[in-house]
Amino acid sequence: MPTQTREPLHMPPPPGLSVIRPHHATIGLLALLGAAVAAAPARAQFLDATAAAAGPGRGDVRTLKYKVGLVVTAEGGPCTGLYATLPVPDEWPEQKVRIVAEDVSPAVRNLRYRTLPGGVKQMVVEIPELPAGKQARAVVTFELERAAIVVPDDTAGLRIPEKPDRAIKAHLGTSPYIETRDPKIAALAKTAGKGLDGWRKVEAIYDTVRDKVEYRNGELKGARRALADGWGDCEELTCLFIAMARAEGIPARTVWVEGHCYPEFYLVDATGQGWWFPCQAAGTRAFGAMPDQLPILQKGDNFRDPDRPGKSLRYVSEFLKGATVKGAGDPQVEWIREGG
């Protein structure tokens, strides 16, 4: 069978959408998998309720269940060599994650997790053989603790990093649909932030984006076209804010949550300590804060997936491939993403 991928149709695909995909196998080692998730990197330390005055503050914490996985059926014949990857929630300063349940069929021989460069966590599922008409499933239930973010107590000393490290510098270039080097975008960013620095400069860019681009649903078109057309949805406003921020040397990235996205920007204090701050590009104004507590799926907008070589991905979607064998069936897959 040919390789199949599902890219988000303007936003991450909605839960319950049936598409053709393979899945990764798993042995029911819940304790082992839970330990893997619990082994959070330093970036994932949960926000302290008494954080530094210049850092993001932690608001209310919401606990929720979130299911991720797939159900695959071999139609028209047997399927072999099924291999699937799908993104799963990971830990971030405002989100804690742990596995609380798993539902895995015997046909699934291996299930594991991996983290791509840039920080996207994937579930990898392998099904060596699936007889005609049979069904296999691999569904994992996560428990998320998702904190709202409040504006720092002291923003006056926050500034744009002069010498960001390699990880932060990665959020200064171009990304799919984020045309950082577009002359009109760069000129608008320069005008918006003229005479300002740090927090005030980023806020001026934020207000300019919301003033120049009307929030309206439509096709995915990116920052350049959104500015030219004067309208776009949450992705366009997010793309334009990120492009303008990066044009002024301000690291910025996309935060993908269930059914929505928004940008984050990075500033440092006088000691060089840095933080990511969110803002709501579309909808109710929220700068440097995020009242929404939707499940965070990914952060970033320029990923590389070894299963999709040569492609720059703004969002890492589900992926399936299987062996091409004469008389083989067609794997019909329902991707599961429920909760929030």
Predicted regions and their residues:
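Bacterial N-terminal signal peptides that target proteins for export
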Residues: 7-28
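Bacterial N-terminal signal peptides
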Residues: 26-36
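Boundary at the C-terminal end of the N-terminal hydrophobic targeting segment
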Residues: 38-44
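Intrinsically disordered, low-complexity N-terminal segments that are enriched in acidic
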Residues: 44-149
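Secondary-structure boundary elements
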Residues: 136-137, 144-229, 240, 316-340
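Solvent-exposed loop/turn segments at secondary-structure junctions
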Residues: 146-147, 212-213, 231, 258-261, ...
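Hydrophobic/aromatic-rich core segments of domains that either
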Residues: 236-316
